[in-house]
């Protein structure tokens, strides 16, 4: 949608903490500032009804979190297995977490993510080049930790080798 990111585009649970933690808190507390901010989001955990199309596959339903990333760590709160993430493969990692039905399901989802068990039924992890997210809800995004307003349709495409780095 005309915006670029290098690290992560995300929506849902704990996404707000990436752009609402104050710079002073981040300077003083580092990673812990995000955790404190994220804890405040626990009471407002809610599903977002979306349709996600990724390289010809379609995922529909209620998700509490979604991310399109090129990293093993998302705000320090979510970790991806470094053996499954390649920075130079021309693909993003698409991570979707389905809305748990019960508190036990939520606990199991958190355990699965902590243990990097991506075969858990509430977890979708794919390597993709192109993603389209469609929703009728207000779905704010975070792009590399900066607030990005909701849009009914968000298109994300990996642009391999789009940036050229020079050494002096």
PLM region spans:
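Well-ordered beta-strand positions enriched in small/hydrophobic/aromatic, beta-favoring residues
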Residues: 5-6, 66, 94, 131
